[in-house]
């Protein structure tokens, strides 16, 4: 080793030590932030929402679990109450039953949430629906239904709870969006539109809430291995009942829930939780849009030919419910 190498070596060790100390302090702050925080989670009966309930409960948060299925929420509460953690004080969760697509029900639910918990520190807008179909064969009523749940529902609940957060000068709004809030792919028009609207709204909200010290985190996951496609219904209400390959190969909800927990604890502004190909697609859309459009066109042509999507009569819009 020459003199320069000997000089660099202690600097490198010092840098590693400083970084390690920074990560330790960050973890401690994150734990203190989540412990005893009042956390509201929509779509808590299954999938990512259910796993988020588990990890935030284990972190010591006070939970308000929201969904449409009372029995499944009761089962989740029982499961959480059966957890035993020596190092963390656990708090009995509350339940609020309502339909996110009903704005009046959302406003009533917000009042009930504040009555039960007294305040809301962290709101996790997780509930939503997914969609499959061609634009030509999709009724406007289907587009509206997707928008009601994925966009207007979270917007209504957020607006109803914001005054309380502003009054307390404390709050954190989280929305589970999608990679498709960043890019649009064929045969996902209603879903992509709802997630693009969600991305835009909460980006605006982040800026407008900064004077009040209220954080906003947008999480953009790719495919998650849940019952998303198994619970699908078609445009006429019949069941779809198929586990899509991309969904089956996706990340586990447990893994994504841990990522959400860390992102909230670190007060991240935005987070992309996706594999290499979707991540590259997001950057390609920005850096080389013409190439991205060509790839999407080729994808649409290939699938149209394979599926025989020619007339309005040969495709039913598929809607996947995840609430």
Curated annotation (Swiss-Prot):
Ligand binding (NAD(+)): 46, 48, 191, 195, 226
Family to which this protein belongs: Belongs to the short-chain dehydrogenases/reductases (SDR) family.
Entry's Gene Ontology molecular function annotations: oxidoreductase activity
Gene3D superfamilies xrefs: NAD(P)-binding Rossmann-like Domain (3.40.50.720)
Places the protein is found: Endoplasmic reticulum membrane
Protein's gene: dhrs7b
Keyword set, alphabetical order: Endoplasmic reticulum, Membrane, NAD, NADP, Oxidoreductase, Signal-anchor, Transmembrane, Transmembrane helix
PANTHER family: DEHYDROGENASE/REDUCTASE SDR FAMILY MEMBER 7B, DEHYDROGENASE_REDUCTASE SDR FAMILY MEMBER 7B
TM region positions: 5-25
Record-given protein name: Dehydrogenase/reductase SDR family member 7B
Gene Ontology cellular component list: endoplasmic reticulum membrane; membrane
Membrane topology, from the record: Single-pass type II membrane protein
InterPro entries xref list: NAD(P)-bd_dom_sf, Sc_DH/Rdtase_CS, SDR_fam
Superkingdom of origin organism: Eukaryota
Stretches in topological domain Cytoplasmic: 1-4
Enzyme Commission number, as recorded: 1.1.-.-
Top-level enzyme category: oxidoreductase
Pfam families assigned to the protein according to its UniProt record, in alphabetical order: adh_short
Ranges in the topological domain labelled Lumenal: 26-272
Residues forming the catalytic site: 191 (proton acceptor)
């Amino acid at each position: 080793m020459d003199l320069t190498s000997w000089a660099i070596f202690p600097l490198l060790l010092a840098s590693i030590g400083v970084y390690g100390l920074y990560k330790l302090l960050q973890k401690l702050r994150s734990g203190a932030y989540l412990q005893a925080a009042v956390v509201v989670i929509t779509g808590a009966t299954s999938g990512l929402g259910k796993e988020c309930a588990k990890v935030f409960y284990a972190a010591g948060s006070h939970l308000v679990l929201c969904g449409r299925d009372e029995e499944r929420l009761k089962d989740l509460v029982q499961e959480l109450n059966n957890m035993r953690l020596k190092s963390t004080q656990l708090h009995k969760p509350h339940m609020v039953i309502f339909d996110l697509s009903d704005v009046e029900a959302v406003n009533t639910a917000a009042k009930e949430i504040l009555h039960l918990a007294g305040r809301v520190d962290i709101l996790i807008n997780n509930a939503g629906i997914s969609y499959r179909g061609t634009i030509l064969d999709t009724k406007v009523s289907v587009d509206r239904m997707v928008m009601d749940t994925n966009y207007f529902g979270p917007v209504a609940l957020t607006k109803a709870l914001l005054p309380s957060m502003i009054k307390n000068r404390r709050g954190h709004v989280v929305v589970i969006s999608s990679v498709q809030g960043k890019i649009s792919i064929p045969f996902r028009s209603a879903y992509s539109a709802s997630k693009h609207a969600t991305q835009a709204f909460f980006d605006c909200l982040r800026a407008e809430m900064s004077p009040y010290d209220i954080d906003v985190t947008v999480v953009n996951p790719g495919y998650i291995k849940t019952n998303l496609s198994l619970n699908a219904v078609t445009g006429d209400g019949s069941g779809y009942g198929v586990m899509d390959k991309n969904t089956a190969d996706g990340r586990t909800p447990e893994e994504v829930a841990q990522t959400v927990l860390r992102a909230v604890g670190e007060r991240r502004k935005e987070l992309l939780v996706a594999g290499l190909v979707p991540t590259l697609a997001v950057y390609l859309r920005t850096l080389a849009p013409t190439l991205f459009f060509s790839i999407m066109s080729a994808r649409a042509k290939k699938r149209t030919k394979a599926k025989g999507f020619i007339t309005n009569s040969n495709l039913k819009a598929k809607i996947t419910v995840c609430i």
